């Protein structure tokens, strides 16, 4: 088992990574003390697979545990689902000492985290991510949110969990398309922060796709370490943390335009990352060779590298101008400057974006 710490002073928390961790009460004990009431929130896909196991482990800590099962899908990452959680907590007369456990992928983690941040002005929660995307990215760092029809993650809060427990054996039940979606975020870390990791991915992507345990532990651990370091230095995304949004400005536009859930988040980010690489090349920031390597690795990961055929420049810009990184009406993009480094650029000419998007 690997253990990584997110260093945020008195709000620091551990990330535990390994196999068969759901049977280890000690990993939950740092966040859940004896006698506390616990609500495990999951979805209709994950709950039948893992809820009983996780609940039994938490009960071993002498806690009362209940389950709230929600519908599955990005289309349910809404204020309506948030309100459903609130109603469950209020009807159950849960106090401020309740602990919420987010058992599922990124949607569950985001909406449960936002509910934990909001219920009685903040209660403890634990992230138990079950998809590759949530294990390497969304479960770490405290970003919580729900979507709005006009934009993704527009309603939310920064709110850190008390612990993250990552059991990579969950990936055995993950559909291939969902695994590929998670690979988009894995590749992202290599592009923005670690050239050697990118090279390792080029050499080992087939091992990851075959669910090789050693390769998975290394990749998940490396991603979590990079994110933990970034979050520790810039929790509220005022500086370097913005680099974690590589591909996301383009990607969120695809998700919003196509309808949440029709393109998976990682699929949209993959296409967005390729657009960002091509934009960087047009701006003289990135070599053609690096654009080719970035594009090929996404292709090998079974990810899209082009936009939906129904979208054009105008449909992209409509959504991109609502991005949270827009300042004073100016679009700001994360662009790679080489494999292993990136920067936020705010002066990309619209004719360049039009050329890249409509190519």
From Swiss-Prot:
Binding site for NAD(+): 72-77, 106-110, 130-131, 143, 152, 170-173
Catalyzed reactions: 7-phospho-2-dehydro-3-deoxy-D-arabino-heptonate = 3-dehydroquinate + phosphate
Alphabetical GO biological process terms: amino acid biosynthetic process; aromatic amino acid family biosynthetic process; chorismate biosynthetic process
SUPFAM superfamilies: Dehydroquinate synthase-like
Pathway: Metabolic intermediate biosynthesis; chorismate biosynthesis; chorismate from D-erythrose 4-phosphate and phosphoenolpyruvate: step 2/7
Keywords, ordered alphabetically: Amino-acid biosynthesis, Aromatic amino acid biosynthesis, Cobalt, Cytoplasm, Lyase, Metal-binding, NAD, Nucleotide-binding, Zinc
Subcellular location: Cytoplasm
Co-factor binding details: Binds 1 divalent metal cation per subunit. Can use either Co(2+) or Zn(2+).
Gene3D superfamilies (UniProt xref): 3.40.50.1970, Dehydroquinate synthase-like - alpha domain
Family that this chain belongs to: Belongs to the sugar phosphate cyclases superfamily. Dehydroquinate synthase family.
Protein name: 3-dehydroquinate synthase
Organism: Photobacterium profundum (strain SS9)
């Amino acid at each position: 088992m690997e253990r990584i710490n997110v260093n945020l002073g008195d709000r620091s928390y551990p990330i535990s990574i390994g196999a068969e961790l759901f049977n280890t009460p000690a990993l939950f004990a740092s966040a859940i003390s004896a006698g506390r009431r616990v609500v495990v929130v999951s979805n209709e896909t994950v709950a039948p697979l893992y809820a009983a196991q996780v609940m039994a482990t938490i009960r071993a800590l002498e806690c009362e545990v209940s389950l709230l099962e929600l519908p599955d899908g990005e289309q349910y990452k809404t204020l309506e689902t948030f309100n459903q959680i609130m109603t469950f907590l209020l009807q159950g007369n849960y106090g401020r000492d309740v602990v919420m456990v987010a058992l599922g992928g990124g949607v569950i983690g985001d909406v449960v985290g936002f509910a934990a941040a909001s219920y009685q002005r903040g209660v403890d929660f634990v992230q138990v991510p079950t998809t590759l995307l949530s294990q390497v990215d969304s479960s770490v760092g405290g970003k919580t949110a729900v979507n709005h029809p006009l934009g993704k993650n527009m309603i939310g809060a920064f709110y850190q969990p008390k612990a993250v427990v990552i059991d990579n054996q969950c990936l055995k039940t993950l559909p291939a398309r969902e695994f590929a979606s998670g690979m988009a975020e894995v590749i992202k870390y290599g592009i923005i922060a670690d050239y050697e990791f990118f090279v390792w991915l080029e050499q080992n992507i087939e091992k990851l796709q075959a669910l090789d345990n050693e390769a998975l532990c290394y990749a998940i651990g490396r991603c979590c370490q990079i994110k933990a370091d970034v979050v520790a230095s810039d929790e509220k995304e005022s500086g370097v943390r913005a680099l974690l949004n590589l591909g996301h400005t383009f990607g969120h536009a695809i998700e919003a335009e196509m309808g949440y859930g029709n393109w998976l988040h990682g699929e949209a980010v993959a296409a967005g990352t390729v657009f960002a690489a091509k934009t960087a090349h047009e701006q003289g920031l990135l070599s053609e060779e690096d654009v080719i390597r970035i594009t090929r690795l996404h292709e090998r990961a079974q990810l899209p590298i082009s936009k939906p055929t129904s979208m054009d420049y105008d449909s992209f810009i409509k959504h991109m101008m609502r991005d949270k990184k827009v300042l004073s009406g100016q679009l700001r993009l994360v662009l790679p400057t080489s494999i292993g480094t990136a920067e936020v650029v705010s002066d990309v000419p619209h004719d360049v974006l039009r050329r890249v998007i409509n190519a």
